[in-house]
């Protein structure tokens, strides 16, 4: 479709005719620390393009919290030892860098650790506040060979990526205040692979499988969403025409030529008895009502399972339809179609 945008002629077929992924499927084995996601179908080559872009953004640009400085009572610098402590201060600092935090504020936070004991001191001994949570309390900080006092104060900040100690801004550089190299990224690992996907009888499409491992301060689903938003914002500067206007023109054209299969009754689809009964129980009588539902909504329907969903999806694919379609004024158009049908049959 060609549309006019000022003095520019826009060919919307450049993107409108590309196959688009229907949804992002989350693997049932996913949890708060690990997520596996499947995106299909994609045009050939798009799996690698999108997968690699998301991976790079996830690893480099996600905001997270980390300790940026620590003050250890009685210690003037990190190149020393503490009597009664098995580790030297350099090793203690390395252990502190391994502590992961979740923060609910952009303001710097200060946490304290105070113990009087013998044995292992861990991140669980840090006194949390309402804005900061320790995500790996089992992380060892130091080992005390005798009963003794140990006190530390940590400065926690938000940031992204890896920041060397000499690159931190606004930190007090004084004796006893040890500034740390900080790894803010909440993403521990990202992996992706690309497989073949089928659309109708065609198999030359991509299926993107991406796995995300986090420290728990952000869910894998949110991390994927944030990285996609970053890419979208960064790429928007390259678009030199009115997106909204072109989308409205496309919508007008599609309204004039609705897929006639949308007006078919559910009984005409020759579905299994179970699938048909589930649709009728959900008050879905025609295909146009069905395709406006999302797959997630359908799976919440009583007695409607994955097997029925796959069966219906195959039927919709054969009619070049899919779940989650937006059909403006469909009820009105359905009534107009019924009137034309009655008139033609009279």
Curated annotation (Swiss-Prot):
Look up the domain of life of the source: Bacteria
Annotated region Alpha C-terminal domain (alpha-CTD): the residues are: 258-346
Q: What is its EC number?
A: 2.7.7.6
Q: Name one GO biological process term.
A: DNA-templated transcription
* A molecular function GO annotation: protein dimerization activity
Catalyzed chemical reaction(s): RNA(n) + a ribonucleoside 5'-triphosphate = RNA(n+1) + diphosphate
Q: Looking at the record, which segments are called Alpha N-terminal domain (alpha-NTD)?
A: 1-242
Q: Quick one: a GO cellular component term?
A: cytoplasm
UniProt-listed InterPro entries:
DNA-dir_RNA_pol_insert, DNA-dir_RNA_pol_RpoA/D/Rpb3, DNA-dir_RpoA, RBP11-like, RNAP_asu_C, RNApol_insert_sf
Gene3D superfamilies, per the entry: 5' to 3' exonuclease, C-terminal subdomain, DNA-directed RNA polymerase, insert domain, RNA polymerase, RBP11-like subunit
Assembly, in brief, is: Homodimer. The RNAP catalytic core consists of 2 alpha, 1 beta, 1 beta' and 1 omega subunit. When a sigma factor is associated with the core the holoenzyme is formed, which can initiate transcription.
Query: What the protein does?
Result: DNA-dependent RNA polymerase catalyzes the transcription of DNA into RNA using the four ribonucleoside triphosphates as substrates.
**Xref: HAMAP family:** RNApol_bact_RpoA
Family to which this protein belongs? Belongs to the RNA polymerase alpha chain family.
**Domain notes for this protein:** The N-terminal domain is essential for RNAP assembly and basal transcription, whereas the C-terminal domain is involved in interaction with transcriptional regulators and with upstream promoter elements.
Q: Read off the NCBIfam families from this record.
A: PRK05182.1-2 (NF003513), PRK05182.2-5 (NF003519), rpoA (TIGR02027)
Full protein name: DNA-directed RNA polymerase subunit alpha
Species whose genome carries this gene: Maridesulfovibrio salexigens (strain ATCC 14822 / DSM 2638 / NCIMB 8403 / VKM B-1763) (Desulfovibrio salexigens)
